[in-house]
Amino acid sequence: LTNTLSANTMAEDVTTMLAGELEFDPPADDYIGVVNVVGTIQEQTQSSVLDTSSGYQHNTTMDYIDNLMDDSDNKGILLYVDSPGGAVYESEELHDKLIEYKETTGRPIWTYMAHYAASGGYMTSVTGDKIYANKNTVTGSIGVIMSGYNMSGLYEKLGIRYVSITSGVNKDSSKLTDEQVAIYQSQVDECYQEFVNIVADGRDMSADQVKALADGRTYTAKQAKANGLIDEIATYQDVMNQMASELGVDEFYTPSSEESILAAIFSKAEKLVPKSEAQILKETAEEKESGVLMYYAEQLQ
C-alpha cells in the first residue's frame, strides 16, 4: 500500500511539473482581467510522459474566470480570442461560464478577435458586450461538424478484421446505415439550433437573421461588421486603451502560466523521437476529433 501511494504521489508530482501551474496573483488595485482563448477549445489530455499539453487549457481557463468572479477588485474581462473553435461540450461550457461571470458580477466583457475567431471561437466571442476584430480576422463559420474516418480499406490491406458484438442495431456504427446517418444528423441539427440561439441572444438578432449567415462559411472582418457579427474593426492596443478609458481602470492582468523547465525539455525531446505510421494515423484521427460533435472551422492547409 505504501509503495502504491508513493508511486501515485510521484506520478502526480511529475504531471504537475510537466503541466506547470497557473498563478492567480492579481494587482492590489482595480484591474481588468485578460482571458486568452488561443487554440482549439477542447479538453486537454496526455497519453504519455512526452505528450505535454500546449495551447488552450480548458480547466485552467474555467478556474481563472471563477477567480475573477470572486475578486471585487476585478472590474471586467478583456477576452482575447484566437481560435478556430473546438468541441461542442467545451465551447458551450466556456460560453456559459462567461455568461455566468456577467450575470453574477454585472461587470462587462469586451472581446478582441485576433487571427481566427471562428465557429466555437465565435460562440465564445459573442459573450462580449462589445466585439472588436483585427482588420485581417477570419470569423463566422457558425455551424456544427461531426466527422470520422472509414478505415476499412486500410484494415483489409493490413489483414485486420473488425469484430463487434452489440446489444442493438445502432450500437455499432463502424459501417453507417441510413438510419444511423439520420440519428447523427439529428444531433448535429440540435447543436446547430443551440448555436443559432446563442448568436441571436448575443448579437440581438432574430434566429432567422442568424440562419441566413450560418451556413458554415467564414467572414472577413469587414463582412462580419456589415452583417452585424462584430461591432468595430480595431487593433488590440486601441481596444485596451478604449476599455481602460471607459471603465476608468488602467491595469490589465494576465495570470502567469510559464511552461515548466521539465515540460520544455520533454516537449523538445518528443519532436526528436521518430513516429511510427500507426502513431501518425492516431494523431491525425485525434486532431480531427473523430466522431465528436464540433463547433470547428476547417483551415486550409
Predicted regions and their residues:
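Zinc-dependent metallopeptidase catalytic helix centered on the HExxH motif
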Residues: 127-146
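Short amphipathic alpha-helical segments
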Residues: 92, 124, 144
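Short, conserved loop-to-beta-strand elements that form functional interface hotspots
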Residues: 119-121
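Hydrophobic/aromatic residues within transmembrane alpha-helices
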Residues: 124-125, 224
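N-terminal organellar transit peptides
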Residues: 1-110, 116-117, 130-132, 148-301
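Hydrophobic/aromatic ligand-binding patch that stacks against planar heteroaromatic rings
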Residues: 123-124, 154
